[in-house]
Amino acid sequence: MAEFHDDDAQFEEKSKSQIKRELHALQDLGERLTTLQPQLLERLPLTDPLRKAVLDAPKHKAHIARKRHIQYIGKLMRDQDVDAIVALIEQVDTSTRQYNERFHALERWRDQLIAGGDAALDAFVGEFPDCDRQHLRSLVRHAQHEAAHNKPPAAARKVFKYIRELDETKRGLR
């Protein structure tokens, strides 16, 4: 009778299911690469065949052809430094999320200024002391007038643009 005394050796090998999960994760990462913009792809440490395959992916329109191409990208991903790719993608996602959060905060400021009157204007000037209060009040008044007369929101866009410029100046982006 053969007895197994070396239990650690039994668990060192990956199961077939674990290998499949890892390969599917590589395919998912490869599919995520196909959604990135070309200038972001240039920053990734990809081999030439993988870069070409990722750039060729949008050409495959049919479902089966696209699926097959994603599987091919997953196969090419096996030879890549996946950690570096994941790190850069997470960095891009984080910066995009931060940009969107800041954008929505500025939209809320615009809406508060147009709806809120002097109290909202005072709060805004407290947050952005470099603001030209008279100019902003004029822009807000025009936006309120447009909203009251159901006109296109051109002045509201000008308010947003001015707020965005102030925010970029405050954050040192201008």
Swiss-Prot record:
One GO BP annotation of this record: assembly of large subunit precursor of preribosome
GO MF term list: ribosome binding; rRNA binding
UniProt keywords, alphabetically: Cytoplasm, Ribosome biogenesis, RNA-binding, rRNA-binding
Gene3D superfamilies in alphabetical order: PSPTO4464-like domains (1.10.60.30)
GO cellular component, one term: cytosol
InterPro entries, per database record: DarP (IPR006839), DarP_sf (IPR023153)
Keyword Chloroplast carried by entry: no
Record flagged with keyword Nucleotide-binding: no
Subcellular localization: Cytoplasm
Superkingdom of the source species: Bacteria
One of the Pfam families matching this protein, by short name: DarP
Its job: Member of a network of 50S ribosomal subunit biogenesis factors which assembles along the 30S-50S interface, preventing incorrect 23S rRNA structures from forming. Promotes peptidyl transferase center (PTC) maturation.
UniProt record similarity statement: Belongs to the DarP family.
Protein's recorded name: Dual-action ribosomal maturation protein DarP
Organism the protein comes from: Pseudomonas paraeruginosa (strain DSM 24068 / PA7)
Name of the gene: darP
